[in-house]
Amino acid sequence: MNRFHISGPKNLSGEIKISGSKNAALPILLTSLLISEPIKLKNVPKLTDIMYAIKILTKLGVKIKVEKKVLYIDAKTIAICTIPDYLTKKTRASIWILGPLLARFGQAKISLPGGCKIGKRKIDLHLSGLKKLGANIAIKNNYIIGSVITKLIGNTIVLPIASVGATITIMSAATIATGITIINNAAREPEIIDVANFLNKLGAKIIGAGSKNIFITGVLKLHGGSYTIMPDRIETGTFLVAAAISNGSIICHNTKPNVLINLTKKLCETGAQIKTGTNWISLNMKGIYSKAINIKTAPYPGFPTDMQAIFSLLNLVSHGNSIVTETIFENRFSYVSELKKMGAKAQIKNNSLFCYGVKKLYSATVFASDLRSCASLILAGCIADGTTIVKNIHYIKRGYERFQEKLQSIGAKICN
């Protein structure tokens, strides 16, 4: 059934092992097309978006073996360079296959990508970046059709906005292009560093990932090897907030505290007690009535847009009023009307959410409309009085591995 029945309120406390990062695993998996030798990817989360990416690669002729959290990939031989819409419409990440196909094979035909419906999320920057590397690209009958006469050629590309997706597309395509490519105003997200580390381990020459300027010296080819995907910082943040909203205490293991400073700093401002180690973060909110604080999403190292819906829930059940400003995507407050059904008090004005804290939420039947709103509504159900029904839970499986089981392990009462 595409719904959860959640009984609350429950105190969410315990220990969680964080899974591999969805936002790193997807581009790394798809850029494996650049490599003709066998690859071993470890710590790959079991998610529907990963499954769709595997189906796309398999359709192209890539051989993939799955063993728990490990993928064995052999892209030595590609049968076709065309991806039909029934595959690309399932995940927006499918756009990341365009660069590797053009760089290695000189041709590509993919249907326009799908994914969560959050704002416009244009692909213009991906296409313009590839054009500056020498690709010929046109859109016909809902398909992106690309070709390269000989090889992609390095160039200096200035991104008008620091797009994560476009940075990854250009960086991956440039690894086996001729000459040097410079990406100015590149996105700085940790997942971009992870993609660069993966490519560098297999022979790429990328310098500056994680800064505003990335330099890529094209190499003739990449070689095979093994790589471990970084932990998921958004999953970590989600479970930290889960404990915070329920006056709980949690330890998140197998994570990277240094890439979560933008979030943990804000959690401390709410009153949470945060401790960190080399690969763990703990939060204690027992006996503490959280304070509502203002947040504003921004490209990394700013506050992550993927945490906006989840942190807003904390504001809505905290003491005082606050303003949440969304600067990355349009239409990312779809969850607010659903939380209002549960007793939340909020008002949307343009790209800002005005939160008026309440002490308690109440059960209701609510509908998720994207991945992060689904997580927010599920967490709301965990602390609401009564039994909440969250529908459209298929979204949660796109970005959280074993979310139901992990929540149950820290005290949530959830069933289908």
Swiss-Prot record:
It holds the Pfam family EPSP_synthase. Pathway: Cell wall biogenesis; peptidoglycan biosynthesis. The active site is at C116. It is an enzyme of class 2 (transferase). GO terms for molecular function: UDP-N-acetylglucosamine 1-carboxyvinyltransferase activity. It is found in: Cytoplasm. The modification 2-(S-cysteinyl)pyruvic acid O-phosphothioketal is found at C116. It comes from the Bacteria. It catalyses: phosphoenolpyruvate + UDP-N-acetyl-alpha-D-glucosamine = UDP-N-acetyl-3-O-(1-carboxyvinyl)-alpha-D-glucosamine + phosphate. GO terms for cellular component: cytoplasm. One of its GO terms (biological process) is UDP-N-acetylgalactosamine biosynthetic process. Its EC number is 2.5.1.7. Phosphoenolpyruvate binds at K22, N23. UDP-N-acetyl-alpha-D-glucosamine binds at R92, D306, I328. Its main location: cytoplasm. Cell wall formation. Adds enolpyruvyl to UDP-N-acetylglucosamine. Belongs to the EPSP synthase family. MurA subfamily. This is UDP-N-acetylglucosamine 1-carboxyvinyltransferase. It comes from Buchnera aphidicola subsp. Baizongia pistaciae (strain Bp).
